[in-house]
Amino acid sequence: MSIEVVSKAVHKNARISPLKASQVLRLLRGKPVEYAMYQLSFMNKKAAVIIKNVLKSAVANAEQKGIDPTKLVILEAKADKGIMFRKWMPRAHGRATMMRKNTSHITIALGELQEATEEAK
C-alpha cells in the first residue's frame, strides 16, 4: 500500500500557541480522518476546535477533487510558529510592560490509501 498527498489545509495565525496545538496534532498524525474527527469532538481543549475546522477544510478540499473521504488518512499535521501579537499593559507607577500572545500556523495534509496492484510487485 502506498500513500500520496491529495489535499492540504492551512490556518495561518491561529490564536493558540504552537506548543498547545502540537500536543493535539501529535495524537492525530497517521490516523484515519473519521477517527480523528471523532477524537476531536470529545477533546476538551481549545486547540481541538481550531484543528477540527482545519481538518474539515482539508476533507472538503479532497471532496472537490472527487476523492472518497472514508479512504483519507492524516499524513502531515504540524503547528509552526506564527507572528507574535504585542500590546502594552499598564503597570504601577506609570510603567508599562509588553504582553506577548503567540500564534501558530496549523497545517494538515491528507493522503488517500491506495491498494498496491499485482503489476507493481
From Swiss-Prot:
<comment type="subunit">
    <text>Part of the 50S ribosomal subunit.</text>
</comment>
<dbReference type="InterPro" id="IPR005727">
    <property type="entry name" value="Ribosomal_uL22_bac/chlpt-type"/>
</dbReference>
<keyword id="KW-0699">rRNA-binding</keyword>
<protein>
    <recommendedName>
        <fullName>Large ribosomal subunit protein uL22</fullName>
    </recommendedName>
</protein>
<comment type="function">
    <text>The globular domain of the protein is located near the polypeptide exit tunnel on the outside of the subunit, while an extended beta-hairpin is found that lines the wall of the exit tunnel in the center of the 70S ribosome.</text>
</comment>
<dbReference type="GO" id="GO:0019843">
    <property type="term" value="F:rRNA binding"/>
</dbReference>
<dbReference type="Pfam" id="PF00237">
    <property type="entry name" value="Ribosomal_L22"/>
</dbReference>
<keyword id="KW-0689">Ribosomal protein</keyword>
<dbReference type="InterPro" id="IPR001063">
    <property type="entry name" value="Ribosomal_uL22"/>
</dbReference>
<dbReference type="GO" id="GO:0006412">
    <property type="term" value="P:translation"/>
</dbReference>
<comment type="similarity">
    <text>Belongs to the universal ribosomal protein uL22 family.</text>
</comment>
<dbReference type="InterPro" id="IPR047867">
    <property type="entry name" value="Ribosomal_uL22_bac/org-type"/>
</dbReference>
<dbReference type="InterPro" id="IPR018260">
    <property type="entry name" value="Ribosomal_uL22_CS"/>
</dbReference>
<keyword id="KW-0687">Ribonucleoprotein</keyword>
<dbReference type="GO" id="GO:0003735">
    <property type="term" value="F:structural constituent of ribosome"/>
</dbReference>
<dbReference type="InterPro" id="IPR036394">
    <property type="entry name" value="Ribosomal_uL22_sf"/>
</dbReference>
<comment type="function">
    <text>This protein binds specifically to 23S rRNA; its binding is stimulated by other ribosomal proteins, e.g. L4, L17, and L20. It is important during the early stages of 50S assembly. It makes multiple contacts with different domains of the 23S rRNA in the assembled 50S subunit and ribosome.</text>
</comment>
<keyword id="KW-0694">RNA-binding</keyword>
<dbReference type="GO" id="GO:0022625">
    <property type="term" value="C:cytosolic large ribosomal subunit"/>
</dbReference>
